[in-house]
Amino acid sequence: MQVSVENTSALERRMTIGVPAERIETEVNKRLQQTARKAKIPGFRPGKVPMSVIRQRYEDGARQEALGDLIQATFYEAVVEQKLNPAGAPAVEPKSFEKGKDLEYVATFEVFPEFTVAGFDSISVERLSADVADSDLDNMLEVLRKQNVRFEVTDRAAQNEDQLNIDFVGKVDGEVFAGGSATGTQLVLGSGRMIPGFEDGLVGAKAGEERVLNVTFPEDYQNLELAGKAAEFTVTVNTVSEPKLPELNEEFFKQFGIKETGIEGFRTEVRKNMERELRQAIKSKVKNQVMDGLLAANPIEVPKALLENEVNRLRVQAVQQFGGNIKPDQLPAELFEEQAKRRVELGLIVAEVVKQFDLKPDDARVREMIQEMASAYQEPEQVVAWYYKNEQQMNEVRSVVLEEQVVDTVLQKASVTDKSVSYEEAVKPVEAPKAD
């Protein structure tokens, strides 16, 4: 087998492969012999059909099959011989495949970038530390109460946090527009569900009252036909309901699976959950800084095939998350390219760190992570058992642990500053990092 390789770009390779005619004929004959053993042809007993008849009937098909298999096999042999690491399937262009002659074809493909991760000492990380104070716990209890609020009809004027049942008709330039009308809509004032000015315009309204609201759609409104336009909404208030927060009692505690331990037992469980959330938030923020630092210190070119695969995966994710009748390939690729590029770059860099430092998932950390996740459930022992019986889930946990070990490895070499902050600041979400 003859092989030559041409570098057509930083990552693209054009490999010409020649396969001797003798090897092709050997593969063709092997398939014809297999066919002869089972072929059923009138006038001949099974297995006794002359090879000349078999060849006449089946040679073309056997040759096509042999050529396809040989291209696949010899491509793999060639990349191993040339020590290449393809990052996707090749585009194959046959150059010569006449019967009795050598097969020659060209395979064009991308390879994974070869690089060494460096610049660890240029990475700066701010590592937060915080505690769950009693005041934080009290605030969380209020949040839980508000999440379980009930509304009772009242005859007083509407205030912020009241729930209104309304009918409305919206007009732009004096014309009713699509999606601008509804009946029996429940709206909590101050929730920010409606465009600016709409909810404020209903403060003070009573049941049975009609109000005309003059508002303007935001410039960045999702419907471009309405963005920045003035609108008039005629709103009828059907009912006004005031919020009633539940008492912190046994009935309320049971909603969270906590029984017969009273308010102190409930506070203890909520604190545990807050502490778990705190640990995860701090860990996540450190990880994001480490990943940003690795990207900044190690600019690499990524194979287009990997980028396309990641874009397609994100498209499918988006359809699954948001639903609708749209197909993944109907979503513009540009929407996902930055996120896909970041993910692919990080995947390659993290994999290289694992390789450079010979990292393996730590079994003790795997157990610890499973127990941590299981502790959020009412029957943690069953959750732990489920993980250990599910190899796919175990592999996912191992991957997360290995990524954490990469972060730890980087932290040992990076510049780390510790900072004490409040619980609220520590758990506050940060904006998703953007690709460069």
Curated annotation (Swiss-Prot):
Q: Disulfide bond as a keyword?
A: no
Highest taxon of the lineage: Bacteria
Q: Which residues form the PPIase FKBP-type domain?
A: 161-246
Q: Name one GO cellular component term.
A: cytoplasm
As its record notes, the protein acts as a catalyst of:
[protein]-peptidylproline (omega=180) = [protein]-peptidylproline (omega=0)
InterPro entries named in the record: PPIase_dom_sf, PPIase_FKBP_dom, Trig_fac, Trigger_fac_C, Trigger_fac_C_sf, Trigger_fac_ribosome-bd_bac, Trigger_fac_ribosome-bd_sf, Trigger_fact/SurA_dom_sf
- Pfam families in UniProt: FKBP_C, Trigger_C, Trigger_N
Which keywords does UniProt give here? Cell cycle, Cell division, Chaperone, Cytoplasm, Isomerase, Rotamase
Quote the protein name from its UniProt record.
Trigger factor
Q: Gene behind this chain? A: tig
